[in-house]
Amino acid sequence: MAIWLDQDSRVIVQGMTGSEGRKHTQRMIAAGTRIVAGVTPGKGGQSLTFEEDPVPVFDTVAEAKAATGANTSVVFVPAAHTKAAVMDAIDAELDLVVVITEGVPVADTAAFVAQAKKSGRTRIIGPNCPGIISPNQSNVGIIPSTISGPGRLGLVSKSGTLTYQMMFELRDIGFATAVGKIGRAHV
């Protein structure tokens, strides 16, 4: 039984138009993740094509959620813009926000974590984390989808590399969900 992320998760990629966002969007789609939109302020109205399917880009998370029914976001924006991106997702009342970006100032992280707690709705994983995966259902972040298959185990790890290693070592058993949260992450 997957937790927090499953085949019904509808995912927004914040920063999808940037090189990292685009690269990892392609990889997440190839893993079966339902990417429903991208968000990049000032680039709303565009669309990017992945595996021959266009993915619309919006200026705000609220616009993307209204148009697509999204409930999850993954953040691939520069550290200087991460706080604003995460606050946008919290204000739109998404269920889960996965912050991949590293180098986010501690004060910015504290501010968006406090806002998420105040909202009572949005769960934050990250920043500076590899993300979350429910194998053969959805993969949000940068965890390789090929290192393990589905199963009954759950994993929460403070280390990205050890997340991958544990998933690989226990691949014959498989995972319901694995979360790489890194040291200062807030779940």
Region roles according to the model:
Residues V13, A37-T40, V57, V99, ...:
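General beta-strand structural signal in soluble alpha/beta enzymes
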Residues M16-T17, V39-G44, A79-A80, V99-P105, ...:
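Short, ordered loop/turn segments at secondary-structure junctions
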Residues T25, V61, V86-I90, M167:
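Generic hydrophobic/aromatic pocket-lining and core-packing "Φ" positions
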Residues R27-E51, P127, K181:
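NAD(P)-binding Rossmann-fold cofactor-contacting core
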Residues A66-T72, F76, A80-G103:
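Rossmann-fold NAD(P) dinucleotide-binding segment
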Residues E102-I125:
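Rossmann-fold NAD(P)-binding glycine/threonine-rich loop
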Residues S148-H186:
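Short glycine-cluster motifs
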